[in-house]
Amino acid sequence: MLITFEGIDGAGKSTQIRKLAAHLRSQGQEVLTLREPGGTEVAENIRLILLESRHDITPVGELLLFSASRAELVNEVIRPALKEGTTVILDRFFDSTTAYQGYGRGIDLPTLNSIIALSTGGLKPDITFYLDILPEEALIRKFSEKSIPLAFDNDELDRMERSGLDFYRKVYEGYRCIMQEEPDRFVSINARKSIQEIHTTVTKTLKEQRAGRQS
């Protein structure tokens, strides 16, 4: 089973992934947690390039770097793990590319979708949890975590984090459009709820989905 978590930076994905992985392992399941970009030696090196604040990367270059990282991760790690029956939990997948590079950077969606199809080989998540929080609130969380002032030119921010509020508003609206296109795959959760409330929703949803598959 492939489970993905999506949402703008600061939504709380990493926390929920850790809790879900621990929950599933406690039930005796084999679980692999991964992040995008990353997960292989090549992909982690691409991640460093993408997030380095001194790099000035064009939107198309950014898209292709993310896609190269994804192609490596899918073929080298995700597909083999799924074949062995491992539950894979992924922090971001191609929906992030659609939201960030498509809606955020303005890349033509048909072109973007072709590149996504090539990099994933058609692999899709079984379920995607979207942690919904307004960009303004998410960014306040993010800056608070780093204990830095709310300023996008701060040297402690990575290249993506320096993109600005208008960019994140476009990304947020992009996610809303994506979910409307595939409502059966997405589970939208209010990210302003407590960590435990969100976790309970996630585990309950997965339990119900698995019960539905077995019936």
UniProtKB/Swiss-Prot annotation:
Where, by residue number, does ATP bind? 7-14
Q: Which SUPFAM superfamilies does this one have?
A: P-loop containing nucleoside triphosphate hydrolases
- Which GO BP terms sit in this record? dTDP biosynthetic process; dTTP biosynthetic process; dUDP biosynthetic process
The coiled-coil segments of this chain are none
- Protein's UniProt keywords contain Oxidoreductase: no
Asked if Hydrolase is a keyword of the record, the answer is: no
The EC number on file is: 2.7.4.9
Q: Which reaction does it catalyse?
A: dTMP + ATP = dTDP + ADP
The protein depicted here goes by the name: Thymidylate kinase
Organism ancestry: Bacteria, Pseudomonadati, Chlorobiota, Chlorobiia, Chlorobiales
